[in-house]
């Protein structure tokens, strides 16, 4: 039995295919979804989406949004997303270093919040590349 997974951003469809299982980062922690999962709607945190296709696991960096699960269909609408395989490791590492430097130079609460958000996004992209398969 499989699940139909659709990952959408405002600009494009990132994924639309059948999967065996996913592990999704939500605002209240990670949840695993298998076929016949109870219906749920949840906020999606900045984090990693793990996708199992048969014996292979893939990763995707998600930048926050919402997910709806029901009737073996999963729809994830996010601000932005990248497949782990599409992320350039050197560029992701440079972005992480820039985000860390921006946080250390942040002045005022607003700059600190924006720098922390940029740092979370950068860390998620690096994690999507470096995650170890199950």
Swiss-Prot record:
GO molecular function, one term: proton-transporting ATP synthase activity, rotational mechanism
UniProt keywords, alphabetically: ATP synthesis, CF(1), Chloroplast, Hydrogen ion transport, Ion transport, Membrane, Plastid, Thylakoid, Transport
Compartment(s) where it occurs, according to its Swiss-Prot or TrEMBL record: Plastid, Chloroplast thylakoid membrane
InterPro entries: ATP_synth_F1_dsu/esu, ATP_synth_F1_dsu/esu_N, ATP_synth_F1_esu_C, ATPsynth_dsu/esu_N
SUPFAM superfamilies documented for this protein: Epsilon subunit of F1F0-ATP synthase N-terminal domain
Function: Produces ATP from ADP in the presence of a proton gradient across the membrane.
Family (UniProt): Belongs to the ATPase epsilon chain family.
Subunit structure: F-type ATPases have 2 components, CF(1) - the catalytic core - and CF(0) - the membrane proton channel. CF(1) has five subunits: alpha(3), beta(3), gamma(1), delta(1), epsilon(1). CF(0) has three main subunits: a, b and c.
Protein name: ATP synthase epsilon chain, chloroplastic
Organism: Drimys granadensis
